[in-house]
Every structure is written in C-alpha cells, then in structure tokens.
Amino acid sequence: MSLSVEAKAKIVADFGRGTNDTGSSEVQVALLTAQINHLQGHFSEHKKDHHSRRGLLRMVSTRRKLLDYLKRQDVARYASLIERLGLRR
C-alpha cells in the first residue's frame, strides 16, 4: 500500500523548499525512504512476496542514485538530508 495523501503532504512540507516543491532531490529521497520503511514492515509479515520485493529493490536503487546525484551537486544538503532521515551513510 502506498503512502496516504496526508503523509506525502507532510513529507513535502518538511523537506521541500516551498509548498509545491515535489520534485527536488530531498523530497524525492524522503518520499522513497518513507515508502521503503513502510514496505520493510510488510516483508516482516509476508516473507515470500517476491513481486513486491523487486519493487522495493527498485526503490532502493532509485534512492541511491538520487543520493549520489545530491552528493555530487551539494555536499552540505546531502549531509543534512542523511542526518534528518537517519540513513547510515
């Protein structure tokens, strides 16, 4: 199940530069992180759901690419985002 409209709006408000900023790298990474965290709970219950696991791996790969792009463009924004999201890098 995907994130609710309210949850997405809260993430956009927290990580975006404006109210309609849905395309910045920070917002995209934050949305992907929320979806990944939601799916991790799903997999603790449904261990053999390989179809959804493929989607999860795709999301993780997309997030990794966005983080690499952000790190190349602006290291300070990258470090701030990693800290705010609690990612390990």
Swiss-Prot record:
One of its GO terms (cellular component) is cytosolic small ribosomal subunit. InterPro entries: Ribosomal_uS15, Ribosomal_uS15_bac-type, uS15_NS1_RNA-bd_sf. GO terms for biological process: translation. It comes from the Bacteria. Part of the 30S ribosomal subunit. Forms a bridge to the 50S subunit in the 70S ribosome, contacting the 23S rRNA. PANTHER family: RIBOSOMAL PROTEIN S15, BACTERIAL AND ORGANELLAR (PTHR23321), SMALL RIBOSOMAL SUBUNIT PROTEIN US15M (PTHR23321:SF26). Belongs to the universal ribosomal protein uS15 family. One of the primary rRNA binding proteins, it binds directly to 16S rRNA where it helps nucleate assembly of the platform of the 30S subunit by binding and bridging several RNA helices of the 16S rRNA. This is Small ribosomal subunit protein uS15. The lineage of its organism: Bacteria, Pseudomonadati, Pseudomonadota, Gammaproteobacteria, Enterobacterales. The gene is rpsO.
